[in-house]
Amino acid sequence: MVVETGVNKLVRLQGKIEGINSKIDEADLRRANAKSSIVEASSRLEKAEGEVASFQRRIRLVQQNLNDVTERAQMLQSKVDNLEDVSESVKQARNQYEEEEAESDEKIQNLEEEVKVKKRELEENEIKLREKERRNVVVHRDIEAATVKADAIEKRIEILENTIKNGLESIKDLEEREGRTNEKENNIAEQISFLDNKFKEVEIRIEAAERNCNVLEHNIKETSEEIKTWKHNTHAIEEEIAAMDDVGDDDTQ
């Protein structure tokens, strides 16, 4: 009985030892698992710290964006206030524009009528200008004809002068050859008188031709001045019409 009891104790002791060893193994396993958990927890902690730092950076960016948005909101509010003021000004300007538009329509009609009148005046001036130019051509032709006549008269004068000179020489020859007789003196006097009359007639014609030339030159100058005046007036009317057309286009726009 005593032996069996010792054996039983030994068995129980071995069982306890095995239980203790089993618990030690379990403890080692738990410790290993705990170390693995600690390593994993450290890794997760580092990752979490990185995520926290990232979140903090994102928070700072969000805060900065929020500040920017706040500033933009304030600017937009200021612009909205300004736009409200501008809107009121636009309303007033629109009312004023509508009032002026009615007056502008009447002004445009008046300008259109004035442009029509100016265009008619321009057409009339162009007709008068063409007539002046035609008259100028005629005057130039008359001057050319008068010049030709003057040249012919000068040639005739030269011929008459030569004739008078030859006549005087002939008279001197007759006086030297035949002496002085009353009959010859009368004939010579008649010839001289005839030649003098012819010379005076030629001088009168020359003076008339010169007067005609002077009149023609004066007419040409007056015609040229009138043409310049008409051209100047026509140019001024064209500029005035162009200015009125521009004003009408601006008012229409």
Swiss-Prot record:
Pfam families: Tropomyosin. The keyword Hydrolase does not apply. Signal peptide: none annotated. Residues 7-253 form a coiled coil. Keywords: Coiled coil, Repeat. Belongs to the tropomyosin family. Homodimer. The molecule is in a coiled coil structure that is formed by 2 polypeptide chains. The sequence exhibits a prominent seven-residues periodicity. This is Tropomyosin-1. It comes from Hydra vulgaris (Hydra). The lineage of its organism: Eukaryota, Metazoa, Cnidaria, Hydrozoa, Hydroidolina. The gene is TROP1.
